[in-house]
Amino acid sequence: MVSSTTPSSGEYLLEMSGINKSFPGVKALDNVNLKVRPHSIHALMGENGAGKSTLLKCLFGIYQKDSGTILFQGKEIDFHSAKEALENGISMVHQELNLVLQRSVMDNMWLGRYPTKGMFVDQDKMYRETKAIFDELDIDIDPRARVGTLSVSQMQMIEIAKAFSYNAKIVIMDEPTSSLTEKEVNHLFTIIRKLKERGCGIVYISHKMEEIFQLCDEVTVLRDGQWIATEPLAGLTMDKIIAMMVGRSLNQRFPDKENKPGEVILEVRNLTSLRQPSIRDVSFDLHKGEILGIAGLVGAKRTDIVETLFGIREKSAGTITLHGKKINNHNANEAINHGFALVTEERRSTGIYAYLDIGFNSLISNIRNYKNKVGLLDNSRMKSDTQWVIDSMRVKTPGHRTQIGSLSGGNQQKVIIGRWLLTQPEILMLDEPTRGIDVGAKFEIYQLIAELAKKGKGIIIISSEMPELLGITDRILVMSNGLVSGIVDTKTTTQSEILRLASLHL
């Protein structure tokens, strides 16, 4: 509902002032402010659990604030649903896209508000209006295409176009580039800047510092439910923002390298996946205590390497040798028995059971080993091992019965890593291990990885973040179009050299 209080000066499109919100035993927001100007891109930053989501839920009426005021275009607002917010010009593009995959693009654009001709939907008008918006935003998508046939990046464009169709003045974007290629990211940034030119205020949420400095004008930082600062980005450094987010200065983004790679424990020769296009003739060694990175552009088939090693993909040729003995992993169970573990890329869809507790999520990969002599589960051992995961991985949680979906991304990832360590692996493979994780939690994950390498684990890390690979690995294997284009020593290589190798077979 929009009230008719006195308009503000007009300097801001959106003013959230002194917002407070409490839950039983928890002060989620404590006097928080967010002020967004027209013609601006405003970063909203903070560690997971800082209060960003709660603040936006108060804006959209999903939560009712306890106190504070929200002004939109100078008038006090009190929305009771996201639909009401959208109809009044405030839209959100979620990290998990809200589209009907079986319907056409234009159906998704106008769902619930179809243009009609008499008693029927006016398909021609719907097509024309969709096409006009796409043309204005330089979106090259057929309005009649089925959404399920599109890429993630194209789906995000549709969500943005939908916000545009509502004539949204405030557009909130939550981690919009997490699954995009560099080319797709650049196209997305072009569209965001077009919205800015039209007078929109964009609230941009991302853990990727490089994007924030490339795109945004101002930043608001939250920490532990409190407003810390709102400042122009032009006067800030990455270290300054990190210090505001975590409450202390992070003297280093990556832990010191104390691991000393030993003998070769894994030899991969001419590994080729059965179903092509995929990896072809992949060869490399992995040493005890070594952290081997895998780099490459999107489509380089990096993930196919670890999936083939883990038995998810069937190999058609090549050999896998562990401690001098040839092995074959026909499925995940065989891989686990041979000492392999895989932390998958999509944490929420393939890594965790979000609505089940930490105990279940800690033990699921090893559950058959908890049966006693009569075939019943040994609850005492299960509880003990769950507590080991919580303690050794430094998981921040009230207890092992806590639903894992309620934890931050960093703590979820720690549970997944701990789960695999219970299987006592020799080879730990991590696919995008810090995706969607805030900067403080990233450092904790890096520390865990470094500690595991120091204990002699062979570690393989796939990452799209070049600074991450250069910061924590010993060597980097570079993939290009399913082929190994080079293996480089991290100490002596450069980002430009890795990018050159990544483009070698395109």
Swiss-Prot record:
Q: Which cysteines link up through disulfide bonds?
A: none
The UniProt entry, under Gene3D superfamilies, shows: P-loop containing nucleotide triphosphate hydrolases
Q: What is its main location?
A: membrane
What EC number is given for this enzyme?
Answer: 7.5.2.11
Recall the GO molecular function terms of this protein's record.
Answer: ATP binding; ATP hydrolysis activity
Keywords from the named record: ATP-binding, Cell inner membrane, Cell membrane, Membrane, Nucleotide-binding, Repeat, Sugar transport, Translocase, Transport
What top-tier enzyme class does this entry carry? translocase
Q: How does it sit in the membrane?
A: Peripheral membrane protein
InterPro entries xrefs: AAA+_ATPase, ABC_carbohydrate_import_ATPase, ABC_transporter-like_ATP-bd, ABC_transporter-like_CS, P-loop_NTPase
| Locations listed in the record | Cell inner membrane
Q: What does the entry list as the binding residues for ATP?
A: G46, E47, N48, G49, A50, G51, K52, S53
Domain spans labelled ABC transporter: 14-249, 264-506
What is the reaction catalyzed? D-galactose(out) + ATP + H2O = D-galactose(in) + ADP + phosphate + H(+); methyl beta-D-galactoside(out) + ATP + H2O = methyl beta-D-galactoside(in) + ADP + phosphate + H(+)
- Which Pfam family, giving just one, matches this sequence? ABC_tran
Q: Which GO terms describe its cellular component?
A: plasma membrane
What's the stated role of this polypeptide? Part of the ABC transporter complex MglABC involved in galactose/methyl galactoside import. Responsible for energy coupling to the transport system.
Q: Quaternary form?
A: The complex is composed of one ATP-binding protein (MglA), two transmembrane proteins (MglC) and a solute-binding protein (MglB).
Q: Which family does it belong to?
A: Belongs to the ABC transporter superfamily. Galactose/methyl galactoside importer (TC 3.A.1.2.3) family.
Query: What's the protein called, per UniProt?
Result: Galactose/methyl galactoside import ATP-binding protein MglA
Supply the source organism for this entry. Answer: Escherichia coli O6:H1 (strain CFT073 / ATCC 700928 / UPEC)
Q: Which gene encodes it?
A: mglA
